[in-house]
A protein has these predicted regions:
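Hydrophobic, well-ordered secondary-structure elements that form the walls
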Residues: 73-76
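Catalytic-core "active-site belt" of small-molecule-metabolizing enzymes
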Residues: 1-71, 82-146
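Aromatic-rich peripheral "rim/lid" segments of glycoside hydrolase catalytic domains that contact
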Residues: 79
């Protein structure tokens, strides 16, 4: 029920990469950040999996067309998923527009990059009529290197 079409591809992809049907998914994605001075997380980005320009079918096809031995169980990542709005950018580099526009947090702190002690929380879910399928959350804290 969450299958959908992705963005219009212009220029049109080569024939072997064209999709004639809904080939991606409506998956809500959020990035939250909490510094050591904060008790609650701030939402810093909200995007959607369907913003991927190249859907996973296209990525796998392109990846394997030259003979790459992709097998069951191999991990393949989509890369950064950014939406059309400023608050839907998918990486710190994009969110801060090349480190020139710091993210302002509710604590009064600013970030152009993650710092030691920062905790990042990723969330993903699909929303239906009267129900929600969550992918859980993925959380990590940056620790000092020494």
């Amino acid at each position: 029920p969450f299958r959908c079409s992705g963005p219009k591809q212009d220029p049109e992809p080569l024939e072997y990469l064209r999709n004639e049907k809904d080939s991606t998914f409506d998956i809500n994605l959020e990035i939250h950040l909490k510094t050591e001075k904060m008790s609650e997380y701030d939402l810093i980005s909200s995007s959607n999996y369907n913003y991927l320009y190249w859907d996973m079918n296209q990525q796998i096809t392109h990846h394997t067309t030259t003979g790459c031995n992709l097998r069951t169980g191999d991990m393949l990542a989509s890369g950064t998923i950014s939406g059309p709005e400023k608050d839907s950018r998918g990486s710190m580099l994009e969110l801060t527009w090349g480190w020139s526009e710091p993210i302002k947090l509710s604590s009064g702190e600013e970030r152009i990059a993650l710092e030691d002690g920062d905790t990042v929380l990723l969330k993903g879910w699909c929303q239906g009529k009267g129900y929600r399928i969550g992918f859980g959350s993925c959380k990590g804290k940056l620790l000092p290197s020494s």
